[in-house]
């Protein structure tokens, strides 16, 4: 359907004023009459544009500190009026048709994100007139265009020029969908905010309010369709948050390679989130969502070489993440040595990209830099429901550790313990990590019993000829029995870091003392399922 509608009159009322003057100038230069409200009208007038205040157009002043501006029949009649049906009644009441509505809403999300936000602040930033105009224009998209995103301004002007002052139905329909998505997201934010202030269970006032809203509304934007999901018979797509405050796989830019698969994205996320844990130059290699090798070094090349040594077999077809710019030397080392699915780093040098270009199927992503880890929510889908928890940003430093054995760890053992503790947080439970000199030497992941994860970590180290004697071992959760300590001692582990908290802690500590192992309690668990 190519039905065009000429753009002769525009109503502009925006909270985010980025680009609005330029857009209004472009409309005005094309003969479009401008209506506006409040601060937007003043901004346009100050820019030298001929603009009519809505209050002058309606003959009704803005009132109640701006709460009532556009809620008037001459405004909504002009937006909702059907051009082929309501012309007579519009003329009878001197209602002029409004062809394009440009609105974005009060900054509710930014307001409630402030530390000192009060309930009154939140209430005053609930937009009423804005969403009403947006929904009115979107409903009447057959005749009216609604614009809620400044990123659409230039494309709209281009289409007006290409279509002799008109917009097509297809464009108006697409803009209407964006508008409904916009108001849905806005109302969801408001519902989530106020829902967290009342008892969470409908009608059950005796239950504690908790930290989560009683109704959860989520809004995500589709970034891409996938060829298939985790398996080829499953359909899939990748959705991202609208406002992302931390560099992540969702913010990443793909510089080369085939389209990312569902599994690529999941594994890249696992690798990137792990490498963010380190301040020093670090490399993480991931396979099937588990780290197969992690190391820090004097450079990312050094870190990569050491991470690769942990498990060269599993590194084949893996995901490699760095926390520094990908440089030429490191790119060359990877490309000449192994098959890799994805390389992700904060940035990549031009020289590095020339190297990776020789392997066009290799996906190279840049995430941008991250300053800090941002609190958020993690979700796990279960049949018929959704589990929600705070993102696991728990960390410990040396001052928070408790040595519970007769022997104190050496400085080297303590460094190794803290290193492998960071890694264990990103290994599927039951997780055991062996490490020495800032390098993993064996990882046991995802076993149903902790002792078998410990045995597997030792087997992996032995298979690669890596010396375990004198190494540290991290466990993501407590040891329910002493057998895990016995298995570690058998291969030469001399320091263990774990949360503690088992009813058999005394037996586990006694086993460590028998073997001369230093044991550290963190009092923090890092299950990962």
From Swiss-Prot:
User: What InterPro entries does the entry give?
Assistant: AICAR_Tfase_dup_dom_sf, Cytidine_deaminase-like, MGS-like_dom, MGS-like_dom_sf, PurH-like
Q: Which residues form the MGS-like domain?
A: 1-148
Q: Which GO terms describe its molecular function?
A: IMP cyclohydrolase activity; phosphoribosylaminoimidazolecarboxamide formyltransferase activity
Output the CDD domains linked to this UniProt entry.
IMPCH
Catalyzed reactions per annotation: (6R)-10-formyltetrahydrofolate + 5-amino-1-(5-phospho-beta-D-ribosyl)imidazole-4-carboxamide = 5-formamido-1-(5-phospho-D-ribosyl)imidazole-4-carboxamide + (6S)-5,6,7,8-tetrahydrofolate; IMP + H2O = 5-formamido-1-(5-phospho-D-ribosyl)imidazole-4-carboxamide
Sorted alphabetically, the keyword list is: Hydrolase, Multifunctional enzyme, Purine biosynthesis, Transferase
Q: What is its EC number?
A: 2.1.2.3, 3.5.4.10
Q: Which domain of life is it from?
A: Bacteria
Q: Which Pfam families match?
A: AICARFT_IMPCHas (PF01808), MGS (PF02142)
* GO biological process: one example: 'de novo' IMP biosynthetic process
Q: Which GO terms describe its cellular component?
A: cytosol
Instruction: Write down the Gene3D superfamilies for this protein, in alphabetical order.
Output: 3.40.140.20, Methylglyoxal synthase-like domain
Pathway field: Purine metabolism; IMP biosynthesis via de novo pathway; 5-formamido-1-(5-phospho-D-ribosyl)imidazole-4-carboxamide from 5-amino-1-(5-phospho-D-ribosyl)imidazole-4-carboxamide (10-formyl THF route): step 1/1; Purine metabolism; IMP biosynthesis via de novo pathway; IMP from 5-formamido-1-(5-phospho-D-ribosyl)imidazole-4-carboxamide: step 1/1
In the record, the note on similarity to other proteins reads: Belongs to the PurH family.
Entry note about domains: The IMP cyclohydrolase activity resides in the N-terminal region.
* Protein name in the entry: Bifunctional purine biosynthesis protein PurH
